[in-house]
């Protein structure tokens, strides 16, 4: 399972490299949707299927509306792909090479594979304690999402609300 999550992580970053290399909005939106789906898959692979589902519904459900508006207004007869321009292809390949070198550096054995500190999350550890062996990670994740992560949900909802108005303003006809 670790290798599947690792492969999804690599594809997740490749999707964002594809978006940041500035292709046509059609392909940029597609790479963001693929990266969002892979991010939800990473969360589900790590044991948080409820949180993965919530992120999938909030991110992909809300942003598909925005992508639909922007793609409808930015349609081109000949959209620019990653291989149609030397600069765009070069930016994509440089980003891909940087990721490959980072992976090689992480697996060289000199550094930890995960160098992040997750201190302060001891309150969420309910599976290893005596009387709570039957509590699934999803339920504690759902409780944490609505208690600790309330501001995350509120901010995500507000950003979706504002992005709809931005999309409507961008697509409004000027007479």
Swiss-Prot record:
Protein name: NADH-ubiquinone oxidoreductase chain 6
Gene Ontology CC terms, in alphabetical order: mitochondrial inner membrane
The keyword Transport belongs to this UniProt entry's keyword annotation: yes
Gene3D superfamilies given in the database record: NADH-ubiquinone/plastoquinone oxidoreductase chain 6, subunit NuoJ
Functional note: Core subunit of the mitochondrial membrane respiratory chain NADH dehydrogenase (Complex I) which catalyzes electron transfer from NADH through the respiratory chain, using ubiquinone as an electron acceptor. Essential for the catalytic activity and assembly of complex I.
GO terms for MF: NADH dehydrogenase (ubiquinone) activity
Record EC number: 7.1.1.2
Signal peptide range in chain numbering: none
Keyword hit for Repeat: no
Transmembrane segments: 1-21, 25-45, 51-71, 87-107, 112-132, 148-168
Quaternary structure, from the entry: Core subunit of respiratory chain NADH dehydrogenase (Complex I) which is composed of 45 different subunits.
Family indicated by similarity: Belongs to the complex I subunit 6 family.
Biological processes annotated in GO: mitochondrial electron transport, NADH to ubiquinone; mitochondrial respiratory chain complex I assembly
Location(s), subcellular: Mitochondrion inner membrane
EC class name: translocase
One Pfam family hit: Oxidored_q3
């Amino acid at each position: 399972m670790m290798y599947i999550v690792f492969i999804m992580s690599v594809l997740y970053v490749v999707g964002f490299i594809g978006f940041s290399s500035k292709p046509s909005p059609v392909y940029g939106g597609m790479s963001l949707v693929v990266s969002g789906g892979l991010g939800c898959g990473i969360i589900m692979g790590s044991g948080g299927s409820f949180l993965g589902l919530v992120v999938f519904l909030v991110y992909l459900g809300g942003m598909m509306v925005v992508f639909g508006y922007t793609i409808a207004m930015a349609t081109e007869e000949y959209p620019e792909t990653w291989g149609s321009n030397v600069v765009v292809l070069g930016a994509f390949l440089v980003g891909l090479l940087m990721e490959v070198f980072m992976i090689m550096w992480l697996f060289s054995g000199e550094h930890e594979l995960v160098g992040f500190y997750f201190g302060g999350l001891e309150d969420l550890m309910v599976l290893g304690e005596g009387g709570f062996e039957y509590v699934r990670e999803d339920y504690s994740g759902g409780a944490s999402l609505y208690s600790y992560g309330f501001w995350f949900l509120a901010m995500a909802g507000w950003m979706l609300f504002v992005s709809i108005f931005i999309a409507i303003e961008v697509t409004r006809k000027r007479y």
